[in-house]
Amino acid sequence: SIRRQRQMCIRDRAELSEDKRLRFTNKSHNEIYVITYQDSPNVMKEIGRLREIAFRAAGGGTGKAMDIDEYDVMENPYKQLVVWNPEAEEILGGYRYLLGDEVQFDEHGKPVLATAHMFNFSEVFLKEYLPYTVELGRSFVTLEYQSTRAGSKGLFALDNLWDGLGALTVIKPNVKYFFGKMTMYPSYHRQGRDMILYFLNKHFGDKDKLITPMKPLEIETDKKMLENLFCYDSFKEDYKILNTEVRKLGYNIPPLVNAYMSLSPTMRMFGTAINYGFGDVEETGILIAVNEILEDKRVRHIESFVKQHPEAMKITSGAHPILTK
């Protein structure tokens, strides 16, 4: 009922205390908080409810009332980064993340990561990358804010989330990489999906095998046809073809795929695995180096935080490589 939701909001609000607020957003006057299941159980339940609704609407999800798993509730849990709309007192969206230097290892020496059931991590990655990496997952925008009817609040929900990630790189100066997944759904056109995956592999494929899918998803479309289609050396020219061809099929390139591609020219793509416990969605592993994020995005999401919080530079000893680049 509406009354119950309203009470939920009041309990949420009490848990979203000032000490958990990370920053204000660049756009839409929203607020970003970092919480855990342990310090904000009601907010966690609301995140789980909203996540499940958003993922299920797209063809994923757990099939339960709430999407909350062991990684959300374990002893050293994933942290939840949420965008809060203070006017409507609602959560607009979120990510969950775990800092690489806080990752635990099981008795077999495997990292306790939400992606460890889908991807193998090389020794090089575990030793040279993981301690400086943030693993991101469960990125969502609340269903009501996904439509154009939500106006500017909805339009900037993803932008707001990235403000949060930008702030993380400042307050955690050892963070050099973001590791995460681009999700595509089984309902997406197969040939369109194959074009996108071929294009990503051609321009961003990881040659070092830092991370590999345990059961790689195989492209169904004829490789020769894709080779002939994407015949340019430049990302820009091939991208024009991709955009045109996907539209011919009556689809768009998924917004997050587009957004990640435009973050950094040196993004690494690790292949695609199927997430069998989550509606069989197709997860493509990616790694982005923070100091290679394109300048306009860096200014927008990272430097704006420093302007809001000049004291944060003391934490980073005033010599953060991203900001002095």
Task: Give the ranges of each region predicted by the language model.
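Intrinsically disordered, low-complexity, positively biased terminal segments
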Residues: I35, P41, R56, K223, ...
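Short, solvent-exposed loop/turn elements at beta->coil junctions and helix N-caps
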Residues: M66-D72, T272-G277
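Acyl-donor binding region in acyl/amide transferases
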Residues: T62, M66, E102-M267, G271
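A short helix-loop-beta-strand connector motif used in the catalytic cores of GNAT acetyltransferases and
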Residues: D72-V82, F105, M267-R268, F278-T284
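Scaffold helices S1-S3 of the voltage-sensor/voltage-sensor-like domain
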Residues: E75-N76, V82-N85, E90-N120
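Short amphipathic alpha-helix that is part of the acyltransferase structural core
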Residues: F24-D69, Q80-A88, L92-L99
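Short, flexible loop/turn elements at secondary-structure junctions
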Residues: T36-D39, N85-A88, R96-E102, R138-L143, ...
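Single conserved hydrophobic/aromatic residue that forms the stacking wall/gate
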Residues: S1-R6, I10
